[in-house]
Each structure stands twice: as structure tokens, then as C-alpha cells.
Amino acid sequence: MIVLPRRLSDEVADRVRALIDEKNLEAGMKLPAERQLAMQLGVSRNSLREALAKLVSEGVLLSRRGGGTFIRWRHDTWSEQNIVQPLKTLMADDPDYSFDILEARYAIEASTAWHAAMRATPGDKEKIQLCFEATLSEDPDIASQADVRFHLAIAEASHNIVLLQTMRGFFDVLQSSVKHSRQRMYLVPPVFSQLTEQHQAVIDAIFAGDADGARKAMMAHLSFVHTTMKRFDEDQARHARITRLPGEHNEHSREKNA
């Protein structure tokens, strides 16, 4: 029997897996930039690209054009087929469906917070606290990733597999569509401050076993997030319209952004 030598990309893929385990990278976390990761592993960028493509095809990683490469959440088959793929199709047809998903999160996350307050173990609480502390990072990319992990840690603490898989499906679909807006929230000091206070209120209620308080705190938080992200999108659309206007308005906008 002839044993074919392993391809270099397969070896690099194994090293990426080992790195994920070594660094305790969790689902939803972003891998280092391609150049940095290639240097870290001591391989060429071409070999790394092939390895990453292999891991994406195996469902280990999730690649977003212009957004980077993320550790992918493990979806049950029913979740992938009935939640993730249909939502991806909707989002591809019309990105504005992201706001419909955000509205659906009200019902889902109100429940996860309620159940987490009733069922969270000491280990669950420790993970929620660590994710919250990571949202305080001065790097908006790290903070926004930690924000996702914070919400999923609460879903895990609900110990309800249907709620958890639904949440994972939502965040998988929303990963790229709201990434920029989520980062912007962490770049605006007053918004960042309110997010921190809201997250702390959710934690306090969950840790105190106050189910109704946790539900209300989560709904207030999501209402703020929805309103803020919608305002960001409207501001961006307004700016785009202004820059297309002829004459004084356009000149004024250019001077303002110069």
C-alpha cells in the first residue's frame, strides 16, 4: 500500500487547531490577522490560506469577507438546517433583515436571562463574569467579540439547548452584518459607558437569582442596542446622501471630514 505524504496545508491546519486549543480560543473569537498568524506559525501566507480554507470547509472556522476568520460555533444539524441557513438566505436577499433578527432576540434573550438567573452554576457565573470583563477592553474589536461571548455565556447558563442553538444561529448570521456597528458602539464613550452599566445590571440580577430582574435588564439592554445601531445606520445613510449632493452641501461635508 502506497502512503502518500501529507500536504503542507494539512500540517498547517493541524497547527492552527493546536493553536486554538493552546490559546483556549472560544467560539465567536477572531483569529489573528493573516500576516500575523503566518509569522506566528512560521509558514507562508499561501500555505496558511489553504489551511484556513480547509478548516472552513470542515466547519471549524467561519470566514467573513473583509471581516476576518472566526472560530465557528458548533451547530446541531437541525439548527444549521432550520435556523442558520434560512436566515443566511434572508440576509443575502436583504441585509435589513438583521433588524428583524435583533427584534427576535428580545424574546429569546429575555428567556435566556430569566432561566440563567434560575439555573446558573458557579462555573457559568465565572464564565459570564470573564466575558463581561473582556468587554471592557480598549480595543473595540476585542470588546465587540467579547460582547457576543457574554450573551452566549448567558444562553449557555440557561441550560436550554433550544435557546442556546437558536442564539448561536442568530449570532452566526449577524457576525458580519452588525460587526461594524457593534465596534462603533464601543468607540463612542457615552455608548460604551451605557453598555457597561447595562451588562452589569444583567449580571447582578442573574447572580442574585432575580429572574424577573434579569429579564427586564436584558430587554432594556437590547432595546438600547437596537435603537443605537439603527441610529448609526441612519446617520451613515444620511452622510452618504449628503456626499452625493451637488454644490454647497457636498463642499461643506468634504470640509467637515477633511
From Swiss-Prot:
SMART domains per record: FCD (SM00895), HTH_GNTR (SM00345)
Pfam families: FCD, GntR
DNA-binding region, residue intervals: 34-53
SS bond list: none
HTH gntR-type domain span: 6-74
Electron transport is among the record's keywords: no
PROSITE patterns xrefs: HTH_GNTR
Reported induction: By L-lactate; aerobically.
BP terms from Gene Ontology: DNA damage response; negative regulation of DNA-templated transcription initiation; positive regulation of DNA-templated transcription initiation; single-species biofilm formation
Any one GO MF annotation of this record: DNA-binding transcription repressor activity
Key words, A-Z: DNA-binding, Transcription, Transcription regulation
Gene3D superfamilies: GntR ligand-binding domain-like, Winged helix-like DNA-binding domain superfamily/Winged helix DNA-binding domain
UniProt superkingdom: Bacteria
Classification via InterPro entries: GntR_C, TF_FadR/GntR_C, Tscrpt_reg_HTH_GntR, WH-like_DNA-bd_sf, WH_DNA-bd_sf
Function: May be a regulatory protein for the LCT genes.
Name of the featured protein: Putative L-lactate dehydrogenase operon regulatory protein
Organism for this UniProt entry: Escherichia coli (strain K12)
UniProt lineage: Bacteria, Pseudomonadati, Pseudomonadota, Gammaproteobacteria, Enterobacterales
Gene: lldR
